[in-house]
Amino acid sequence: ALAGLAFAQVESVNIVGYTTTQISSATWYQIAPTFIPVGGIPEDGMPINDLFTTGFAAGDVLYVWNQTSQSYDFYTWMDEPFDPDYNVLPAGWADSTEIRTEAVLKAGQAVFLRKASAGATSVVFAGQVEGGIVTTVPSATWVQVSLPYPIDVALNDEIAWTGFAAGDAIYVWNATTQ
């Protein structure tokens, strides 16, 4: 009965997927995207306003570590942020001047998120899994990172820590004690 049917082999050059994190109200989270844009490269990053999209309201905040200034860039959710010409844009994350941000996060670039508004939401990261992502830590600086893969690993078992010396430190966010 199947004679004469042709079957095509399907191949893909990329592996795509998604992860979902439940976000409760009045709680701090350290969270990071674990994917790159489909068909993209790790350096592209993903826009903050494409990553954290629904279930947020005025008062919710996002802190992104700025490697250059060694301080946090602060964003707040706005129902009607502006563009540089002060045209009203769709709801999203905006900087202190109320301009909708175009900032991007790379896979493994962690941020602090606090949902101050009532009600829980879900953050869904979707994209392409990229192998071989490397996080570079310049000398005498801080970097806020997360594992760039959506899996749990032991700190000293599956992470290649290279180039570190006595006195270097790592701090791990404890979600329970905040």
Model-derived segments and spans:
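A short, polar beta-strand/turn micro-motif
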Residues: A6-A58, Q67, I99-A166
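Short, intrinsically disordered, charge-balanced linker/junction segments flanking boundaries
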Residues: T176-Q178
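A cross-kingdom feature marking solvent-exposed beta-strand/loop segments within repeated
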Residues: S69-A107
